[in-house]
Curated annotation (Swiss-Prot):
Name of the gene this protein is made from: eIF1A
Family to which this protein belongs: Belongs to the eIF-1A family.
Pfam family, one: eIF-1a
Function of the molecule: Seems to be required for maximal rate of protein biosynthesis. Enhances ribosome dissociation into subunits and stabilizes the binding of the initiator Met-tRNA(I) to 40 S ribosomal subunits.
UniProt-recorded name of the protein: Translation initiation factor 1A
Domain S1-like positions: 12-87
Superkingdom field: Archaea
Disulfide bonds: none
Length: 113
């Protein structure tokens, strides 16, 4: 039996999520396997972040992707969870609006805000 076809809508307007509370922007530096990644966060720290199962089953995260990181309550400067991965279109929008800098994406200086 063929799979049910999904209806594809035209250009949908979706709000770009921004970090809230103690969440941070981060760039994936290295994939470690078993759902773990090293992420360089906007505060200059490199955190070992886990991809929760809810996100792991839906989104493929690669080295160089811009993500939102939620630091853990314990070991907040060393560990965290990846909450969201931005698409390239969303990254371009964040650059245009001044939320992040090109240097942050390429490994240089930190964010503007």
């Amino acid at each position: 039996m063929p799979k049910k076809e999904r209806k594809v809508e035209g250009d949908e307007v979706i709000r770009v999520p921004l970090p809230e509370g103690n969440q941070l922007f981060g760039v994936v530096e290295q994939a470690l396997g078993a759902g773990w990644m090293d992420v360089r966060c906007e505060d200059g720290k490199i955190r070992r972040c886990r991809i929760p199962g809810k996100l792991r089953r839906r989104v493929w995260i690669r080295v160089g992707d811009l993500v939102i990181v939620q630091p853990w309550p314990v070991q907040s400067d060393k560990r965290g969870d990846i909450v969201y991965r931005y698409t390239q279109t969303q990254v371009d929008w964040l650059l245009r609006k001044g939320k992040i800098t090109q240097e942050f994406l390429t490994g240089g200086s930190l964010l503007v805000e």
